[in-house]
Amino acid sequence: MVYLTLQKSQKVFAASRHLHKVAAKALEKSTPEETVTGSFASFIHNVRPDHLSDLVRHRSKRMILDSIGVGLVGSMTHVFDIALRYCQEIYSSSSSSPVSSVYGRRGLKLSPPLAAFVNGVAVHSMDFDDTWHPATHPSGAILPALLAASQMVPAASRPKGLDFLLAFNVGIEVQGRLMRFSSEAHNIPKRFHPPSVVGTMGSAAATAKLLSLNATQCGHALAIAASLAGAPMANAATLAKPLHIGNATRLGLEAALLAARGMEANLLILDDTPGCAGFNAFYDDYQPSPLTLSTNSHEFLLEKQDIAFKSFPAHLGMHWVVEAALSARNLLIDHSGSLSPSAIHTIILRVPLSKYINRPFPESEHEARHSFQFNACTALLDGKMSICSFSPDSLCRQELSQLLSKVMVEHPKDNVANFDKMYAEVTLILQNGDILTGRCDSFYGHWRKPLSRESLLRKFQTNASRVLPKDNIDNLVKTVDNLETLPDCSLLASCL
C-alpha cells in the first residue's frame, strides 16, 4: 500500500514538474511584461492617477455614488439579512479584526473579507446595480472590496482618495479588457454570470492596486482570483444570485491579500497557452492581447464606453420593455380616453431570445425582476415601476394576473440578446381590433441616453434615505464629488 502510494506521488510530482517546464519554456520566450498576464500585472502596478482623464473621473464617481446608494437600500432586503446573520453567527469567533463598515448598519464592523461579502450581496440584492457592455455589473464587484480594504490599512499609511479612485478604475478596466477578449461575452449570458468571473478578477486587481502590491504580486493576485471565480446562470432569479457579487468582491480581495502574503499561482493565467486551460476556460472564443500602458497617457475603456444606470430594481433588459409598455399605455389612454385593462385582448412582446428572463408567471420578487411579462404588464397597469412594484402584494394582484394571461412573446431575428443592440416592442391588440404599439430602442439611463446629474442624485437620495439621515446623505454626496482631494480614503467607508 505504501509502495503504491509512493508510486502515485511520484507520478503526480512528475506531471507537476512537466507542467512547470511547459510554463517555464513559455516564459523563457518572453519577459513577463510581454506575456498577456505580465502586461496586466505591469499595468496594475504602474498606472498612475494622472492617467485618469476628467471624463473617466466623472463617470467613475457617478458609478461609485450610485453603487453606494444601491448598497444602502439593499441592506434592507431579506437576502442581505441572511448573509449578515450568517457572517455574524458562523464567524463570531473569528480572530480577524472587525474593522470594516457594513452598508446600513452604523457602528457594526466585520473583518474586511466579510464586510466586502455582505456589502456585495447588498448591492445586487435587488438587481439595482449598474450594467456595462459587454454585459456585466462592474461596480458592485469592486467597490465593497476597496471600502473594506481601505479600513484595514494602518492609519498612518492609508491611501488617499485619489488612490482609491485610481484603484476603482483599475478594477473596471481589467473587467472590460477581459470581456473584450471574447465576442461571446458581448451578449446576454447563457452559461455563467459574468460578474462572478470578471468581477472577481477586477476586485483582485483593484485591491492589489490600492494596497500597492508589486507587479509580480499583482500577477499572482489575478491568477489566484481565476481559481476562485464562477457561478452558473441557473441561479439567476433566486436568492442565491446576489451571492455572485458578494463572492466576487470578497474573493478578489482575498486573492490580493493572499498574493501579498506570498501565495503564488500561474503567471500565464490570462495567456492563451496551448494545452493549458487558464482564463480561456470561461470563454470558448477567448483571444487575449496585452494591456499596454504608455508613459504619458492611457485611454481607459470607460472613456469610450459609458455605463447604464437602472431607474428601478430589475434585470437591465426589463428597462427596454417597460419604456415600450409605458409608450403603449399612453397610446391607449390617448386612443380610449382612459386605461381599461379589459379593453385589451392580446399583448405581444417583441424581445430578444433569452430563456432566463422569459418568465410568464413569476412566483417571487426575484423571478419578477427577471420577467419580461411581469415588467411589461406592471408598467401597463401602474404607469410606473419602483421598488414597491416587486412586493408580494403587487405580485398577487388579480388584475395583473389577468394581463399576464394575455401576453404572447415573439423573438424577431433582428432583435439580438445584446445590451448595445436590442430593442423592445409592446403591441396591444384591443377587443375592437385596433392595434397600438410602443417601442424602445434606448431607455433613459442607457449609455446612449445617460441619466442627468439630477436624476442620478434623486435615485441616490431616494435609496439612501431609507437608512441614513439627510445630513449623512449630503455628506456622502460631497465626499464622492471631492474624492480626489480626500486625504484618507477610509473616510468614505466611515460615511456608511
Language-model features, listed with the residues they occupy:
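Function-dense linear segments that define catalytic or interfacial modules
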Residues: 114-166, 170-174, 178
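Glycine-rich, mobile lid/loop segments that gate access to catalytic sites or pores
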Residues: 151-254, 273
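Short amphipathic alpha-helical face segments that pack within enzyme cores
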Residues: 140-148, 198, 202-206, 319-324, ...
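Terminal-appendage/accessory-domain detector
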Residues: 2-6, 13-136, 233, 240-250, ...
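Well-ordered alpha-helical scaffold segments within catalytic/enzyme domains
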Residues: 74, 146-155, 204-210, 255-258, ...
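Generic alpha-helix initiation/capping and coil-helix boundary signal
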Residues: 7-8, 16, 53, 160, ...
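Hydrophobic face of alpha-helices
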Residues: 57, 61, 65, 142, ...
